[in-house]
Amino acid sequence: MDKKDKNNETITNINIKTIDLNTRSKDDFLNYANAVNRARAIPLVEDNLKPIHRKILYTFYITKLTSDKEPKKSMATVGEVLKLSPHGDAATYGALVRLAQGWKLRYPLVEMQGNCGNLLGMGPAAARYTNAKLSKIGDLMLEDIDKDCVDFVPNYDESMEEPVTLPGKFPWLLCGNNSGIGVSLSSSIVSHNFTEVKNAIEYYLTHKDTCTVEDLMRFIKGPDFPTGGKIVNGEDLISIYKTGSGVLKMEPHYDIVKSGKNTKIIFHDLPYGVEINDGVKAPLKKYVVDNL
């Protein structure tokens, strides 16, 4: 029997497609995950930057806040970044501050004047109180971007264009520790010493056909974290470098010093990612901790 819609028009052909719910759910989830991971959560291998960090660096470039210029208020830069990104100002400022924190990045991409936080767990000053510009390494990440070496796409409201990736003259993929947690996917690439990476790259370029991971590890001994610390499972490094997956176990360099009835634990550095907040200090209240 024919069916009629609200306009009393006869509908004679109803095309109903039967689909498998499991297959459709899987496909839709994968499409969603890929969109979130690429657009927000996971750094690109080309420059090892998340989209928000790339937008921040590009904003410094187009506003001429390079390393040789005087820094300007972070709040002003955040406002310019929002033209490229629909993020909130607080989230954008947090991402900007991270690019300047020397205990989180082995080679900071932003130079900041004012309080940008510290290892004690203290947060940064408000954006209206700090000034920022690109660091010299930040300059290198954007060098030659005006020479048609990367693709550009419209921003979210198509009012201007932004780069898909940065030229990345500095090997940020290996030297800049960055991580991301997306949908069913996470990434964490640790930092390495620039001189060691440079030497390894030079060796690889002249020994492409025969170069092995073991050869490269003659130059790159292991990760180089900004806060120091020592790797206690160094024997696993070769497997981690070959597979791209693994766990690094770290501990600080420390001395135990006895003075009469008292004992001091003197820490000389910290494992990467550990801050001296209350959670770290609480178990150590009976000791005198010094020399950080």
Protein language model features and the residues they cover:
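Catalytic phosphate-handling regions of large nucleic-acid enzymes and associated NTPases
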Residues: 1-244
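Gly/Lys-enriched N-terminal cap/neck module of very large, oligomeric protein machines
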Residues: 248-292
